[in-house]
Amino acid sequence: MKRAENLVRLEHVQEISTSNINYLVYLSFHRELKKAIKSFAKGRLLDIGCGNKPYEIWCSEFVAEYVGCDIIQSSANKVDVLSPANSIPLESSSFNTVLSTQVIEHVEDHQGLVNEAYRLLRKDGYFILSGPLYWNLHEEPYDFFRFTKYGFNHVLEKAGFEVCEVNANGGAWATLGQVINHTFDFKNPKASKMVRGLKYIFRKLRLFVVVNKLFSYLDAKDYNTINTMNYVVVARKK
């Protein structure tokens, strides 16, 4: 199977609504990503794994140019540079900002992606990076890695970056709620008739809305990141 045959890219920014089954991660992920873009995005920006550039709208007021790189052309033909993430045919030290959201887990040579971001950035440029600690399998079989905050620190510092921020997206309660939503949403043909019935009721009654409201409330009342779903990380090229 060719890499492109099972590759999915985000078409647009997902709506933050309790009717979205992934509400619990988007609630905090979007908040932290917007903050990082507002604080650190500037000048020429390269989006590695850009797809249809869903976050360009958030960056437009802060950057002078938005360049997108991906391994295949997107459905809306938004990709400017077609190349692997670890070997991008662009001039060194030519960008002020590099952005890569929810891509690093799909790159087998993830250190190569981080090294390329470092090479392409100008001195004192910023790398805004995000990736999961918890998420269900997706884009199989090209779903290679999950990262703790220590894992992100390691790969960034190994490339030469100074890590500025590592922000968790959701605490333990939000993570538990997201696991519940994913488990009930997954249609497993091997499940027993009883379990399939329970999952059908969960979906039919839209109980994920209840889960989203309850577990976001619990997360706010008992916030801890011993378990979290995702991280938004900012690093500076020294």
Model-identified regions with their sequence ranges:
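Conserved N-terminal segment of class I S-adenosyl-L-methionine
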Residues: 1-93, 97, 114, 224-231, ...
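S-adenosyl-L-methionine-dependent methyltransferase catalytic module, highlighting the catalytic core
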Residues: 19, 108-112, 116, 126-237
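Residue-level signal for alpha-helix termini/capping positions
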Residues: 37-38, 122, 157
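Residue-level signal for short amphipathic helical patches enriched in basic/charged
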Residues: 40, 105, 147
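Short conserved AdoMet
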Residues: 41, 108, 122
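Active-site micro-motifs of SAM-dependent methyltransferase domains
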Residues: 73, 87, 105, 135, ...
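A short beta-strand submotif of the Rossmann-like class I SAM-dependent methyltransferase core
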Residues: 100-103
